[in-house]
Swiss-Prot record:
InterPro entries: DNA-dir_RNA_pol_bsu_ext_1_sf, DNA-dir_RNA_pol_bsu_external_1, DNA-dir_RNA_pol_su2, DNA-dir_RNAP_su2_dom, DNA-dir_RNAP_su2_hyb_sf, RNA_pol_bsu_bac, RNA_pol_bsu_CS, RNA_pol_bsu_protrusion. The RNAP catalytic core consists of 2 alpha, 1 beta, 1 beta' and 1 omega subunit. When a sigma factor is associated with the core the holoenzyme is formed, which can initiate transcription. This is DNA-directed RNA polymerase subunit beta. The lineage of its organism: Bacteria, Pseudomonadati, Pseudomonadota, Gammaproteobacteria, Enterobacterales. Pfam families: RNA_pol_Rpb2_1, RNA_pol_Rpb2_2, RNA_pol_Rpb2_3, RNA_pol_Rpb2_45, RNA_pol_Rpb2_6, RNA_pol_Rpb2_7. NCBIfam families: PRK00405.1 (NF001616), rpoB (TIGR02013). It catalyses: RNA(n) + a ribonucleoside 5'-triphosphate = RNA(n+1) + diphosphate.
Length: 1342
């Protein structure tokens, strides 16, 4: 493998045995591709904005004299960039402009004669844009639109599995689900009649819908039944015979023909009898007359002489009727063929319970069901039915729905109309009847071929269409009002409803979620999440076990491990690593093609529907060099079952062992040795890890770390290769390689880094360069590390030296004992940034004022404020300190004469304002790192705001000037090269000022042209700089667009440094979580023979019952990795020759059976080897991919190479006594995470605070400064102890005895420590409730 210069800095040793056939795809593509599809111009009009416009336009007036046509649309440029939107609290969006054409037709002239055409571009609101990391900035906060897994449109056949009816009879049903429009359900009832429901309303006999489609009874019977024809000849009854139909019947008379008896009376007819009849070609037999009684007539029979109806279709025949028919001259009688086996008379029975007789009565019946209480008219009934399933405006199956519908009915073509046809409805009924008759299977609703993904683009398009439809009605009315000659398209379109619909979706839809931004992994997982909840999806309460369960089709599409614990389990899933959606929105996963037992490198993506037809081998099947299966029998999956197949039967093979799991689960090393429940917790807790001060790469990883760090977008990645020309904490400048430049550009890439910004979860986002001056860079290299990344690898926690042993009960019940050294070295110190805002409003009594002049506040409290009343940057503040001084006018109160006198003498006016300053919340302390002031347009800016503005302008100017200088330097270097090659001496040039170079003339025409081109570029660059500077200046100095009534907003950012402390929650990656019980002095920690103390002591009892053995293997492998690091460190300290170092490191990389990774250090220069060694001395990072990890043998070999015992256990000594522990202890390195459940955020104690209004009891919860509830069971406990006075105190003065608790104050102040309990307020509430029931209850005073 070829490594770039940056990748050579630290190479992770890989234990994977299977070669990586397919690279890990870009992990955010599900979001980005979907949104791209939504906003890009699609000439076909299949999807996106284009599809929405085409489905609503053209809009015609009611009279048809005019129409508004859609031509095209374009998206403008966003006003602010992403960062500015976040600071200002606005939405990152682009204006949508649509070109519309108003066509007016002549009234009197023939149809289609155009009178006038007007075309105009109309503004249609703002469309939020996706940032390059797949998020949206809505009102200044980053949000993610989660993809939804919903039932695919189409037709589904299902049964109630015998749960509905008490008899346990299985009732079958069919449901046609459109993409938009009314649902159509067919269902059997326990009496085997077929019913229909529209939109889950009252059921009607299913034949009503056929009558509404204009079928007569005879036509209906013709559709669903085969016929038996009886013929009356010479007073004898003959029946047409199809021998196959006799299967399973018992003969009720002798079946004979041509004098030969084939079946005797009362004998069962067998297959032999049928063969005999077929062989002899018997096609009619004589039957006794009684046989026809009870048969059902297939059509109407009329007496042609009198014109009267003898018997109607679907009537049962009797001998009387037969005689009448015979008299009327009907010699042939068609009856329905039914039997009990597989041709039951469901439709015939249903017709008998159907009250309607013709189309109109059927339509009226449907109208009554849909609109109860409204008088039906013929027209209304016809319109309603027409609009239900046959109008393109109201009903759409969509391409997916039509494809699923046709596949379900086994049709060949998969395309067709989006509305239903007669055939569609009758074929669904036929298939349902076949299933009831035992032919065919019901569908599996949880099969991923029946559930599809709706991503951002599709949901946004649907919302946009909803907005357009709202506008459509208004436009129609406007077109019908007349005076069209003066109208322009923009007079008709109101952009409000459209932008409101879009805004509502992005701002408050259930699937538009506040982004989880704890660390890069939580961002990526949130964007790859798939939810079955949300509009048009399931609800938590109604979802049963089946929906939540893992289904065989999840394999390689949805992760079986990563899902939340609790009520949402199984409803919220995560996309597997390689999964993607196809054009229809079904999930598909890649497989390698197998031909004749040879695995090729051809890769096909299969959806769950296609996968069912193939035999698929697992990724860990053993192959020889030519890609043949070594074993004759291979474990494969086929039709959702796993079994053994011979190697020639195999069609496909899995691409990778990680294919099954999601990104989160694929980061857990030795996942294959963990119990699934614990793996689930492990995958979920990695997302809660807080980025530490200094990220530390995991010693034991899985090889996925780099992909996650790069794809998450928190790192800065090189767009093009080149050399590092300049680097500091806030920017990196790359001089681009010649071959990657565009013609005629300066060839400089500038990367500005994010410094100390707040994330959604209040953690700190900060980027640090990880390249040095002059280093060569390749495209895709990581230039700067973000939060939780280390040299471009995900680093969520820290490698800790752990020992598994009990220690004085401090690790009882999963508690964790931590060494003081961890605190001293700041291993788990995290920075949290809080944003506090102070809003100054315009009130009825006058504007609130931000000022340092606050009434009744001492000098000390104002010491950290400047003259504008805003805190200084860098001030260290604690709970209760004033950050922004603000006063609010209060209403004039009636003054006493004395006060009036004092006022008159001293002119004091201070009492008409009250202090409403922004203070630091209790329990928070930190450093002010930034202040932002936003002032409304037209309000005068205060001194601080002007200072900030000045500073921003300076910074912007500095940035742009530096950028210009860098670009100029690059350009002049090229000018210099042209001039020198054109024959001008270099030392003469160096004496000339640079600006004069461009005035020089060259004899060589080519060179002169080049020079002129460069000169043009230079001018362009300068004018570009001026433009940029102007735009920046405008943005910084303009007033801000604030909410109505708001004059000013001051935002203060506090950075809080949190060290690890008892009560914080920590976890490993295997679901092994615990709370810190004690920070132990270093000297008391157990230590080894070299005197190295351990950092963390974990309880060994937490392992066996939880079955997450992965943590033990990780510990051993971590120890080995550290051991090798120690050896490298020793060699570096001794300053051994590079050759020795190279040999040892090479040995470490070559160890094990890995085929994929071949690190050849002989191609590295000495400097590169030394730099690699420098990065490996703290431990050699190791990758052990999921399901393909290091074996026990390999771990032992690595331990041996590191000079450590292969048992993984060492002798420890007690730090307090120095005695040796009785037996050896497992010690090693485990990757530990600090989770975002910090004791500082949870610890809370109430003094005296606010009370609930009705009950007068203290509120609950930290946010309300509430108390601890002393509930019913706690009362029982005090009762049980007989602690009467304590109980009385709890229920009265400490809770809701209003007078008692105020008296208590007075008593304490007076030094009298008695209490006088009164009546609790809740008792009065009880009295009031009883009175409200009409029972008067009064208390008698004694």
């Amino acid at each position: 493998m070829v490594y770039s210069y940056t990748e050579k800095k630290r190479i992770r040793k890989d234990f994977g045995k299977r070669p990586q056939v397919l690279d890990i795809p870009y992990l955010l593509s599900i979001q980005l591709d979907s949104f791209q599809k939504f906003i890009e111009q699609d000439p076909e009009g299949q999807y996106g904005l284009e599809a929405a416009f085409r489905s609503v336009f053209p809009i015609q007036s009611y009279s048809g004299n005019s129409e508004l046509q859609y031509v095209s649309y374009r998206l403008g440029e966003p006003v602010f960039d992403v960062k500015e939107c976040q600071i200002r609290g606005v939405t990152y969006s682009a204006p949508l402009r649509v070109k519309l054409r108003l066509v007016i037709y002549e009234r009197e002239a023939p149809e289609g004669t155009v009178k006038d055409i007007k075309e105009q571009e109309v503004y249609m609101g703002e469309i939020p844009l996706m940032t390059e990391n797949g998020t949206f900035v809505i009102n200044g906060t980053e949000r993610v639109i989660v993809s939804q897994l919903h039932r695919s449109p189409g037709v589904f056949f299902d049964s109630d599995k015998g749960k509905t009816h008490s008899s346990g009879k299985v009732l079958y049903n069919a449901r046609i689900i459109p993409y938009r429009g009314s649902w159509l359900d067919f269902e059997f009832d326990p009496k085997d009649n077929l019913f229909v429901r529209i939109d889950r309303r009252r059921k009607l006999p299913a034949t009503i819908i056929l009558r509404a489609l204009n079928f007569t009874t005879a036509q209906i019977l013709d559709l669903f039944f085969e016929k038996v024809v009886f013929e009356i000849r010479d007073n004898k009854l003959q029946m047409e015979l199809v021998p196959e139909r006799l299967r399973g019947e018992t003969a009720s008379f002798d079946i004979e023909a041509n004098g030969k008896v084939y079946v005797e009376k009362a004998r069962r007819i067998t297959a032999r009898h049928i063969r005999q009849l077929e062989k002899d070609g018997i096609d009619r037999i004589e039957v006794p007359v009684e046989y026809i009684a009870g048969k059902v007539v297939a059509k109407d029979y009329i007496d042609e002489n009198t014109g009267e109806l003898i018997c109607a279709a679907n009537m049962e025949l009797s001998l009387d009727l037969l005689a009448k028919l015979s008299q009327a001259g009907h010699k042939q009688i068609e009856t329905l063929f039914t039997n009990d086996l597989d041709h039951s008379a469901y439709i015939s029975e249903t017709l008998r319970v159907d009250p309607t007789s013709d189309r109109l009565s059927a339509l009226v019946e449907i109208y009554r069901m849909m609109r109860p209480g409204e008088p039906p008219t013929r027209e209304a009934a016809e319109n309603l039915f027409e609009n239900l399933f046959f109008s393109e405006d109201r009903y759409d199956l969509s391409a997916v729905g039509r494809m699923k519908f046709n596949r379900s009915l086994l049709r060949d073509e998969i395309e067709g109309s989006g509305i239903l046809s007669k055939e569609d409805i009758t074929e669904v009924m036929k298939k349902l009847i076949d299933i009831r008759n035992g032919k065919g299977e019901v569908d599996d609703i949880d099969h991923l071929g029946n559930r599809r993904i709706r991503s951002v683009g599709e949901m946004a398009e649907n919302q946009f269409r909803v907005g357009l439809v709202r506008v459509e009605r208004a436009v129609k009315e406007r077109l019908s009002l007349g005076d069209l000659d003066t109208l322009m398209p923009q007079d008709m379109i109101n952009a409000k409803p459209i932008s409101a619909a879009v805004k509502e979706f992005f701002g408050s839809s259930q699937l538009s979620q506040f982004m989880d931004q704890n660390n890069p992994l939580s961002e990526i997982t949130h964007k790859r999440r798939i939810s079955a909840l949300g509009p048009g999806g399931l609800t938590r309460e109604r979802a049963g076990f089946e929906v939540r369960d893992v289904h065989p089709t999840h394999y390689g599409r949805v992760c079986p491990i990563e899902t939340p614990e609790g009520p949402n389990i199984g409803l919220i899933n995560s996309l597997s690593v390689y999964a993607q959606t196809n054009e229809y929105g079904f999930l598909e996963t890649p497989y390698r093609r197998v031909r004749d037992g040879v695995v090729t490198d051809e890769i096909n993506y299969l959806s769950a529907i296609e996968e069912g037809n193939f035999v698929i081998a697992q990724a860990n099947s053993n192959l020889d060099e030519d890609g043949r299966f070594i074993e004759d029998l291979v474990t494969c999956r086929s039709k959702g079952e796993s079994s053994l197949f011979s190697r020639d039967q195999v069609d496909y093979m899995d691409v990778s062992t990680q294919q099954v799991v999601s990104v989160g689960a694929s980061l857990i090393p030795f996942l294959e040795h963990d119990d699934a429940n614990r793996a689930l917790m492990g995958a979920n807790m990695q997302r809660q890890a807080v980025p530490t001060l200094r990220a530390d790469k995991p010693l034991v990883g899985t090889g996925m770390e780099r992909a996650v760090a790069v794809d998450s977008g928190v790192t800065s990645v090189a767009k093009r290769g080149g050399t590092v020309q300049y680097v500091d904490a806030s920017r990196i400048v790359i001089k681009v390689n010649e071959d990657e430049m565009y013609p005629g550009e300066a060839g400089i890439d500038i990367y500005n880094l994010t410094k100390y910004t707040r994330s959604n979860q209040n953690t700190c986002i900060n980027q640090m360069p990880c390249v040095n001056l002059g280093e060569p860079i390749e495209r895709g290299d990581v230039l700067a590390d973000g939060p939780s990344t280390d040299l471009g690898e995900l680093a969520l926690g820290q490698n800790m030296r752990v020992a598994f042993m009990p220690w004085n009960g401090y690790n009882f019940e999963d508690s964790i004992l931590v060494s003081e050294r961890v605190v001293q070295e700041d291993r788990f110190t995290t920075i949290h940034i809080q944003e506090l805002a102070c809003v100054s409003r315009d009130t009825k009594l006058g504007p609130e004022e931000i000022t340092a002049d606050i009434p009744n506040v001492g000098e000390a409290a104002l010491s950290k404020l400047d003259e504008s009343g805003i805190v200084y940057i860098g001030a260290e503040v604690t709970g209760g300190d004033i950050l922004v001084g603000k006063v609010t006018p209060k209403g004039e109160t009636q003054l006493t004469p004395e006060e009036k006198l004092l006022r008159a003498i001293f002119g004091e006016k201070a009492s008409d304002v009250k202090d409403s300053s922004l203070r630091v919340p209790n329990g928070v302390s930190g450093t002010v790192i930034d202040v932002q002031v936003f002032t409304r347009d037209g309000v005068e800016k205060d001194k601080r705001a002007l200072e900030i503005e000045e500073m921003q302008l300076k910074q912007a100017k500095k940035d742009l000037t530096e950028e210009l200088q860098i670009l100029e330097a690059g350009l002049f270097a090229r000018i210099h090269a042209v001039l020198v090659s054109g024959g001008i001496e270099a030392d003469k040039l160096s004496k000339l000022p640079r600006d004069r170079w461009l005035e020089l003339g060259l004899t060589d025409e080519d060179k002169q042209n080049q020079l002129e081109q460069l000169a043009e570029q230079y001018d362009e660059m300068k004018s570009e700089f001026e433009k940029k500077m102007d735009a920046k200046r405008r943005k910084i100095t303009q007033g801000d667009d604030l909410a109505p009534g708001v004059l000013k907003i001051v935002k203060v950012y506090l950075a809080v440094k949190r060290q690890i402390q008892p009560g914080d929650k920590m976890a490993g990656r295997h679901g092994n979580k615990g709370v810190i019980s004690k920070i132990n002095p270093i000297e008391d920690m157990p230590y080894d023979e070299n005197g190295t103390p351990v950092d963390i002591v974990l309880n060994p009892l937490g392992v066996p019952s939880r079955m997450n053995i992965g943590q033990i293997l990780e510990t051993h492998l971590g120890m080995a990795a550290k051991g090798i690091g120690e050896k490298i460190n020793a060699m570096l300290k001794k300053q051994e020759e590079v050759a020795k170092l190279r040999e040892f490191i090479q040995k470490a990389y070559d160890l094990g059976d890995s085929v994929c990774q071949k690190v050849d250090l002989s191609t590295f220069t000495d400097d590169e080897v030394l730099r690699l060694a420098e990065n490996l001395k703290k431990g050699m990072p190791i990758a052990t991919p999921v399901f393909d990890g290091a074996t026990e043998k390999e771990i032992k070999e690595l331990l041996q190479l590191g000079g450590l015992p292969t048992s993984g256990q060492i002798t420890l000594f007690d730090g307090r006594t120095g005695e040796q522990f009785e037996r050896q202890v497992t010690v090693g390195y485990m990757y530990m995470l600090k989770l975002n459940h910090l004791v500082d955020d949870k610890m809370h104690a109430r003094s005296t605070g606010s009370y609930s209004l009705v009950t007068q009891q203290p509120l609950g919860g930290k946010a309300q400064f509430g108390g601890q509830r002393f509930g019913e069971m706690e009362v029982w406990a005090l009762e049980a102890y007989g602690a009467a006075y304590t109980l009385q105190e709890m229920l009265t003065v400490k809770s809701d005895d209003v007078n008692g608790r105020t008296k208590m104050y007075k008593n304490i102040v007076d030094g009298d420590h008695r209490m006088e309990p009164g009546m609790p307020e809740s008792f009065n509430v009880l009295l009031k409730e009883i009175r409200s029931l009409g029972i008067n209850i009064e208390l008698e005073e004694e």
